[in-house]
From Swiss-Prot:
This is Glutamyl-tRNA(Gln) amidotransferase subunit C. Gene3D superfamilies: Glu-tRNAGln amidotransferase C subunit, N-terminal domain. InterPro entries: Asp/Glu-ADT_sf_sub_c, GatC. Belongs to the GatC family. HAMAP family: GatC.
């Protein structure tokens, strides 16, 4: 089987996630991803069965309810700005 996920892709994803992986970790992740994809390929071999769904979504009507006003919602916020929650900068 050819590698469905290669080491370069794993390094790229790790870089995006700001994870440091050494060569051994990358090889391990490549092997694990290959194993996972093989299991999904096996699922394609399972025959489909015509069956009625056992679960049904239960929908309820939307109901208007009282909510917090802006001052109450911001009352416990550690920091606010211009009537909104303020969080730390993310770079």
């Amino acid at each position: 089987m050819t590698d469905a996920v290669d080491a370069e892709e794993i390094r790229h994803v790790a870089d995006l996630a700001r994870l440091r992986l050494d060569d051994e970790d990358v090889d391990t992740v490549v092997d694990h991803c290959g194993d996972i994809l093989e299991h999904f390929e096996r699922l394609e071999e399972v025959p489909e069965v015509d069956a009625e769904p056992e679960l049904v979504n239960v929908m309820r009507a939307d109901e208007i309810a009282d909510s917090l006003d802006q001052d109450d919602a911001l009352a416990n916020a550690p920091e606010t700005e211009d009537g909104r929650f303020k969080g730390p900068n993310v770079s």
